[in-house]
């Protein structure tokens, strides 16, 4: 995905804030691209990345209109290039350097397949979104870029109440968990 962003000539961003976890170095982000940014919040557009085509609109409405006007293009060469990048640059996992985030997420996937995964705020949130392998039976619940430390554990409890037969895995850090550790007692007493 990073290679595709770096090499694309047109980038559609829908409801994205372009925060530093997404963009990296702003001076090097999508250097060849015309950027179209669709967001319902005027303040979010060109806030972090100056865009070429700002669209203030509901994403669903904007996409419906775009699809009415869009012409089908042959993207076979672009798709082939993306597949080459995936093969040439896989997410490498070094097993000779101790435990890595990829290994932890791989272990979570193996132990809890087809589960609901809930993240809190922090680096582990990035690890989960990058390294968990989700399928049609899995679900990822995250607060995104809202910075809501403490979201994970209560959200996991809510997910379990709503889906009592499904495994729910909360991926959190010490700060997020400590903000709501008392809810462990609530979960136990309320079943």
Predicted segments, located by residue:
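A glycine-rich helix N-cap at a beta->alpha junction
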Residues: 189-191
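Glycine-rich, acidic loop regions that bind phosphate or pyrophosphate groups
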Residues: 1-81
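Active-site diphosphate/adenylate-binding microenvironment
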Residues: 83-159, 165
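Electropositive phosphate-/nucleotide-binding environments in soluble metabolic enzymes
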Residues: 2, 53-60, 72-83, 95-106, ...
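Alpha-helical scaffold segments in soluble metabolic enzymes
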Residues: 3-7, 61, 65-68, 103-110, ...
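Structural motif
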Residues: 10, 116, 167-169
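Glycine-rich, anion-gripping cofactor-binding loops and their flanking helix/strand elements
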Residues: 1-36, 135-165, 178-182
């Amino acid at each position: 995905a990073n290679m595709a962003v770096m090499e694309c000539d047109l980038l559609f961003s829908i409801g994205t804030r372009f925060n530093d976890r997404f963009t990296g170095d702003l001076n090097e982000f999508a250097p060849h691209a015309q950027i179209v940014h669709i967001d319902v919040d005027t303040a979010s557009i060109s806030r972090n990345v100056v865009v070429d085509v700002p669209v203030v609109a509901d994403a669903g409405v904007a996409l419906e209109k775009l699809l009415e006007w869009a012409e089908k293009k042959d993207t076979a060469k672009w798709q082939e290039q993306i597949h080459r990048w995936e093969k040439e640059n896989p997410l490498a996992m070094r097993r000779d350097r101790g435990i890595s985030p990829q290994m932890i997420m791989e272990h979570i996937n193996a132990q809890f397949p087809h589960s609901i995964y809930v993240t809190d705020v922090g680096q582990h949130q990035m690890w989960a979104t990058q390294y968990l392998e989700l399928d049609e039976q899995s679900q990822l619940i995250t607060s995104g870029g809202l910075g809501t430390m403490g979201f994970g554990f209560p959200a996991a409890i809510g997910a379990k109440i709503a889906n009592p037969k499904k495994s729910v895995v909360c991926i959190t850090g010490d700060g997020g968990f400590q903000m709501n550790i008392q809810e462990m007692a609530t979960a136990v007493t309320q079943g």
